[in-house]
Amino acid sequence: MKNFTRKHSTILIVEDIDWIRSGMKKAVEHEGYRAVEATNDAEALQLAEREPPELIVTEEELPTFYDLMSHLREHASLNSVPVAIVNPDAEDGAQHGDAYLLADYADITSLLAVLRY
């Protein structure tokens, strides 16, 4: 992944649980990035098509996760956008294809490492 310029980088957070999504948004914005929120794949795709983000953060347990990933990979202008996936069974820093894996949303340090990578 690339190193993101904070003031101009938009991070799309796709999470269906309000308090998790809100916490992630606060952490990302605290570090100087612009955060955009979506609760499902349809909302995420609509936002991403309107203004492609520099990074998408989502979780594998999102009910529409596989639909989201499928649509992103099929969409010409979005298939190169890096994705960070929260998967509790993953080891932080591992990569799965072109996606960066995070073990837990709560570990903000891991997310910030992705942003700086």
Language-model segments: which ranges?
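Non-catalytic signal-transmission and effector/linker regions of two-component phosphorelay proteins
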Residues: M1-E15, Y66, S77, A103-Y117
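As written
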Residues: S9, P53, F65, P88-D107
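Two-component/phosphorelay signaling modules centered on CheY-like receiver
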Residues: I17-V36
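Acidic, metal-coordinating helix/loop segments flanking the phosphotransfer/catalytic sites
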Residues: E37-L55, P63
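Conserved phosphotransfer microenvironments
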Residues: D41, T58-E74, N87-D89
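Hydrophobic alpha-helical motif in two-component signaling modules
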Residues: A48, M69-H71, L78
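His-Asp phosphorelay/catalytic-motif detector in bacterial-type signaling
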Residues: P52-E54, S77-P82
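A short, hydrophobic beta-strand element within the central beta-sheet of small alpha/beta folds
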Residues: N79-E91
